[in-house]
């Protein structure tokens, strides 16, 4: 991946977090990047005397230190040196804060399995981090690998998606690989009642979005393959990713419908929840 020099890995000891750290280590080896691993423990707000524990703060902090020791062992096996940080508080707030304080370029987070609930909601921490940070976020499924052979950009031509386009082109140029790009015409039962002229305009708009990809790619000497699909955007994009065996999906944090800070755009959230490959979410 192009020019990420400071990487923050959120680590909670889960299998998905272990895989995220392993792949972040791969990225660090390739690009000589700097890694900080962050563990966040919750604050204790109850009655200390009821617990019968004399030093509850040390007990809570100890669990976080255990996580960081585990992370160091994993990083040692990967052959990379990491710095560590232990914070107490709301996980998403601390991840966003540390990424800003340390001037990180990229936040790496794991994504757990693909059960129905996990597909529907990718996790409040991940969603809130993406909703509140201005950093790029790489979300890595529990069993995914990281490679560059088949990069898929999802774009609707919005400003945020243009930033994702620029990042995807940087990656493709740096890695000397082609870039595939897809723009989706949203269709449902009501769509087919719009009339032929309206439908034609929507497809022409998707073509214009991809014309920008073609031009920017051509200016950088990057080979680009362009696709228009229709249907529910998250379904069309994830199906496209499966069809081309995508190794990475790149997209904006939100599209034309905007973004709420506590819940990212539903298309982005659903793609992260359903994709088999890592998803790079780019901000403005």
Regions found by a protein language model. Name each.
Residues 20-23, 67, 94, 164, ...:
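Well-ordered alpha-helical segments embedded in enzymatic catalytic cores
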Residues 1-54, 78, 150-195, 199-203, ...:
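Small/aliphatic-rich secondary-structure junction motif
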Residues 17, 64, 122-123, 161, ...:
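Short, conserved glycine- and acidic-residue-centered signature motifs
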Residues 1-2, 23, 54-58, 62, ...:
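Structural beta-alpha unit
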Residues 3, 26, 30, 92-144, ...:
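Gly/Ser-rich helix-loop-strand patches that form or flank binding pockets
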Residues 54-66, 198-208:
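A short acidic, glycine-rich active-site loop
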